[in-house]
Amino acid sequence: SASIASVHQALDAGVNWIDTAAIYGHGHAERVVGKAIQDRRDDVLIATKCGRVWEGESREIGKSLRRESVHREVDVSLQRLGIDCIDLYQIHWPEPDEEIEEGWGAVAELVEAGKIRYAGVSNFNMEQLKRIQPIHPVTSLQPPYSMLRREVEEEILPYCRENQIGIVAYSPMQAGLLTGRFSKERVQNLTA
């Protein structure tokens, strides 16, 4: 397929990082990545995420950081990706808030079990990072970060630097806005 060919082309060009999530295409993205890397596993680091779930035919998206859900999600992601260990496994969103510690504890168990190498989080604020850090070290934080979204610079980046937490920014081109492909008129129409 064109998607697999694109992944191969990226790997051939030296890209060595693929960041996906179970929720992207209801698992389809992980399956495509799995097919694309089946003969090239040593060439790439794989990151995927948990915490967004769907069930049944409706495919309505739910949120769960319950221990059982996180364990089930990693097993399904490993199967879809066709690998035995995920390089970076991240909690996608800190929701529901009251399940953050339970979910992070489950992720720590997955590190101990050898199903994931490193554990990270996405979209967590400072207070949430401080709540989970004592449970298990946070390897990385994936916040939105671009020239237009710089709020992480005030508290989050210094905290991460101090605690040796890597930053894996998402949306650095602000969903395409900073690519130069948006005219002044098009931007004005977005806010209208």
Regions found by a protein language model. Name each.
Residues 7, 30, 34, 74-78, ...:
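Generic structural signal for well-ordered alpha-helices
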Residues 1, 56-71, 93-98:
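Active-site mouth loops of central-metabolism enzymes
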Residues 12, 34-45, 78-82, 111, ...:
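Acidic (Asp/Glu)-rich catalytic clusters
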Residues 3, 10, 18, 33, ...:
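Conserved, mostly hydrophobic/aromatic
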Residues 1-10, 64-81, 123-131:
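Short, acidic/polar
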Residues 94-192:
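Beta/alpha (TIM)-barrel catalytic core signal, keyed to glycine-rich beta->alpha loops juxtaposed to Asp/Glu
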Residues 1-45:
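N-terminal binding-site loop/beta-alpha segment at the start of enzyme catalytic domains
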Residues 78-96:
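Active-site groove signature of glycoside hydrolases
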